[in-house]
């Protein structure tokens, strides 16, 4: 019975299925995962669009409002901002052509009277605007009756020059620019306004001058024209005479002060020391007559030194405490004894005796004997000029022995040369710099 009832029930259900539809809904467990993936893809597409268009669309489709420039990128500099940047710009009419860089240039000169109105100042026309090419940019204010301010040599401004009432400032400033350009064109030391010691070293020595160094390495200068030595550089004096530059006197004073401060305790060295340092230096060539004059003058000076030595010994100055003396040059000693009657008498007596004692065998003597005897007897005069044998020159070679014919009160044999050197030796380090800055040598 039960089976029949079940079979009957199935038949009824089958009949009902033919007329009715049943809808079954199945939930996908992966549905949430697919939704997340799709959302991420959509976000990625939006980011790509933003990178391609970084600015919003309103920026590209913005309405231009000429009245208000506060929200426009093209109106960042309006009339009020221009007035704030440069007060002098309010006098320039908007109708006149203005340089594009003149708007942002600051006001460098405030000499314009604030009470002047814009109507009294004529507006610059387009033909009066001139631009000068340079590295910097500036705008000159419109001043009336004022000359242009000179600029630095290395700073030439890019200026807009205006002409007022037919008067133009361009020729003056162009001349100034050309003058500055001329000063900077040449690097020649002869054209510089200020001569430095480095520039002086590059200049050639004048004619007849020679630069030498003593045993201590101190530089001095020899003038073969006047037979003098000096510490001063003759090239600086030549610059003063020729008149190149404006600040050369100051440069020479600074150079000499710096040089004298470092070597104030030094005096001029002797010629003999310089020749020992540089033996291969070419000596100046002189004629026979000039050499005879030099030999005669050296002999006279030697006799004067011997006379001075005898006077010092007779007066007792050698045994007493020795005060500091100045370095005596040959020319100063000559001036000191020029008015002495005893000295004049000795000169005449020596000239007569030299003529009487001249014999034929003196012509065959070696000239260097006289030079060696002179260098040994007189340590103060260190002269080493080359001598050429000549019959007329050798007639004075017996004069070094003429001190035996001097008056008896001058005891020359008792003289100690080492005690006398402290008075007359020029190359002594303790007496350097005390005497004159210019010394004569023969």
Curated annotation (Swiss-Prot):
Function: Plays a role in thermal stress response and in aging.
Record Gene3D superfamilies: 2.20.70.10
Domain WW per the UniProt entry, residue ranges: 203-236
Pfam families found in the cross-reference section: WW
Keywords: Cell projection, Cilium, Cytoplasm, Cytoskeleton, Nucleus, Phosphoprotein
Biased segments, Basic residues type: 1-10, 124-134
InterPro entries: WW_dom, WW_dom_sf, YAP1
Family: Belongs to the YAP1 family. Highly divergent.
Tissue specificity annotation: Expressed in epithelia, hypodermis, muscles, pharynx, intestine, gonadal sheath cells, vulva, spermatheca and in excretory tissue.
Gene Ontology BP, a term: hippo signaling
Record text on subunit structure and interactions: Interacts (via WW domain) with wts-1 (via N-terminus). Interacts (via WW domain) with egl-44; the interaction may regulate transcription.
Residues recorded as bearing Phosphoserine in the entry: 104
This protein's encoding gene: yap-1
GO molecular function: protein kinase binding; RNA polymerase II-specific DNA-binding transcription factor binding; transcription coactivator activity
Organismal lineage: Eukaryota, Metazoa, Ecdysozoa, Nematoda, Chromadorea
Composition-biased stretches (Polar residues): 13-22, 55-71, 108-120
Protein name: Yes-associated protein homolog 1
Subcellular locations according to the entry: Cytoplasm; Nucleus; Cell projection, Cilium; Cytoplasm, Cytoskeleton, Cilium axoneme
Phenotype of the disrupted gene, per the record: RNAi-mediated knockdown at L1 stage results in vulva protrusion and rupture of internal tissues resulting in premature death. RNAi-mediated knockdown in middle-aged adults extends their lifespan.
Residue ranges of the region described as Disordered: 1-84, 108-136
GO cellular component: axoneme; cell-cell junction; ciliary base; cytoplasm; nucleus; RNA polymerase II transcription regulator complex
